[in-house]
Amino acid sequence: MDSQVPNNNESLNRFNDIIQSLPARTRLTICSLCLLDNISTQLLRFLILNANSPNIIAVLTDQTAFLSSGETEIFQTLVKLFKQIRMIYHTRSPLLSVHDVAPGLWFPNSPPPLILRGHEAFIITAIRKANLLTFLLTSLNCLNYGFELLQSIFLDIFCPNTNTVGNNSLEQSGKFLKSQAILYLDLKTQAYIAGLKEFQDETNEISLEKKQELLDLIFPSNLADILVQRRTGDSGDITLLTPSEKDFVERCDRRRENLKIVQDFNSLTQSYEWAQFIRELLDYCNKNMGLIIWGRKGRGKSPLYDFDVNEFDPQVLFSTGTRTVEFMDDQNQPSSASAFLSTARPNHYSTHTPTTDVSSKNPAITQSIVDAAVAASMSNSSSGPHSSHNNSSNSNNNGSIGLRKPKAKRTWSKEEEEALVEGLKEVGPSWSKILDLYGPGGKITENLKNRTQVQLKDKARNWKLQYLKSGKPLPDYLIKVTGNLEKIYKAKKKFSQSPNSSTIMEQNLSQHPSSAASATEDTQTHQEDSHGQNSDNMPSNGLFGNSTSDNTGFDPHLEDGM
């Protein structure tokens, strides 16, 4: 099979040689897979390209504010097409399996039939794209499945099991990574908040009885048994927990206790923002698309732009028999809280978006945001994932509207600064360990739950530079933090002496005199939003990447806006 991206004709005709001898129903499901893959890919590109812009996604997915023109129509049309194509596959579960695509031919937890040999990688890729899209669209309230589905299929989407055919043993295919555990923890938290939405009134006081009922449902006491049984098929032996699973259970216990003491609904939504969760979810998908779809890291390739069978993990072929609850016909809910979660919908930013985000209410801003977002989407769809930076630069040079993130910069609170200082004193500049102590489900507090490793390093480095510039004695906890004035000054001097640097700056200022300040602000905001987790060997996209020197891209005045 050709390892490159097939052209349209090749993609649509890939099954022509085998379908003639198949039943009519099977022919329909197999032939429709190419269309399902195409629609899923376009929708995933729309969402992933705007991962850091929650207002843009809110505009695209808001069915009640349908624009008469613009690219929201394109997005909503694609969503409708996705729903229609999904109806071709007679499945009682929201997730597709190989049995839905090839009924009577390919059964879950079984090798592909001979007639489909050579096509299995494409089939699994299309199924996984569709299932991931189902998860994301449900999260964005475009599909009405609710939080019960999101909780139950999270592990099936991001780290499915593998049934090793031949010896009837179960092996772990997708490792339960720390970044996945934090996402799962935050998803459970958002499900808890959605269950309490009825208390969003004048008093905002949460009922203790309702709180306890939801906590018992979402953070069950037998969570360890559930994880072990899912992975091994056996229950009762929690000693079989992997280190990452054990860490997740401990984080859930701590998060449960922290949620239990919050009495005010508004305080809950401010501490655990829905928009922040969506940003982190889409950012993880963007950085780990190869792992989610192909079962292994794509070595610089993305399934949204490339189809390479050499990147595909063969073991993924047998991880298609996910045991999901059949939500469509399930009428035996164990409790009222469980019944509520099956219908509870994500809040779609309505109560979680900061008050400074007003673009979705302003038609002019809305139109410019959507136009810029989809312009980036269209240019990337034809050029591949590595051309987004160049396309963005070209659009700015041509004077077109740039894609700016319409969110206010998150100011460091006193509690966050104190937690960072304590973390530096305890473990030094080990940012992952600091987040283990003070991050999501932290062992001490969760004061840094909304901060990334890059942001911690930025903040500590700016503190150190402030002390060095003022001549004050440097605290012991900042001594090992990287950064010194000499390297900063050398970097500035090198830039000022570089050819054409002043000319380029003057040209940019003359062409866009009103955008100079906003460009600096956007750069800093991007650095704040970059995720510094050690996720899946992706290239570092922050200020302090593994391959960058101490002075690369650093702004010594960053602290002024922090």
Swiss-Prot record:
Q: Which Gene3D superfamilies match?
A: Homeodomain-like
Q: What is its main location?
A: nucleus
On whether Cell cycle is a keyword of this UniProt record, the answer is: yes
* Biological process annotations from GO: chromatin remodeling; negative regulation of telomere maintenance via telomerase; snoRNA transcription by RNA polymerase II; telomere maintenance via telomere lengthening
Q: Name one Pfam family in it.
A: TRF
Indicate the segments forming the HTH myb-type domain, all copies: 404-460
Location relative to the cell: Nucleus; Chromosome, Telomere
Oligomeric and partner information: Homodimer.
> What protein does this entry describe?
Protein TBF1
